[in-house]
Amino acid sequence: MGSVVAILRVMPESPDIDLEKLKKALKDALPGIKDIQEEPIGFGLKALKLAAIVNDAGGETDALEGKLNAVPGVERAEIIEVTLN
């Protein structure tokens, strides 16, 4: 099995959340994160778009979403793209 790059969008719970603290919490929860960018959504809310390298074994992407959704301050994490590493 190889690895893939998963691109995810993470929506914070509110526009008032400290995005730098959330970025650190996400990196702590998932060491495979390689890049995090802020993406304006509207009304002051910003999503975080991140790239993570994960094993391409079955169920790994679901587990990835689960880990990120469990981070305090995350409203929702969803995979928007998966590509070969």
Curated annotation (Swiss-Prot):
It comes from the Archaea. Keywords: Elongation factor, Protein biosynthesis. InterPro entries: eEF-1beta-like_sf, EF1B_bsu/dsu_GNE, Transl_elong_EF1B/ribsomal_bS6, Transl_elong_EF1B_B_arc. The keyword ATP-binding does not apply. One of its GO terms (molecular function) is translation elongation factor activity. The keyword Protein biosynthesis applies. The gene is ef1b. NCBIfam families: aEF-1_beta, PRK00435.1. This is Elongation factor 1-beta. SUPFAM superfamilies: eEF-1beta-like. It comes from Methanoregula boonei (strain DSM 21154 / JCM 14090 / 6A8). Promotes the exchange of GDP for GTP in EF-1-alpha/GDP, thus allowing the regeneration of EF-1-alpha/GTP that could then be used to form the ternary complex EF-1-alpha/GTP/AAtRNA. Belongs to the EF-1-beta/EF-1-delta family. Pfam families: EF1_GNE (PF00736). Disulfide bonds: none annotated.
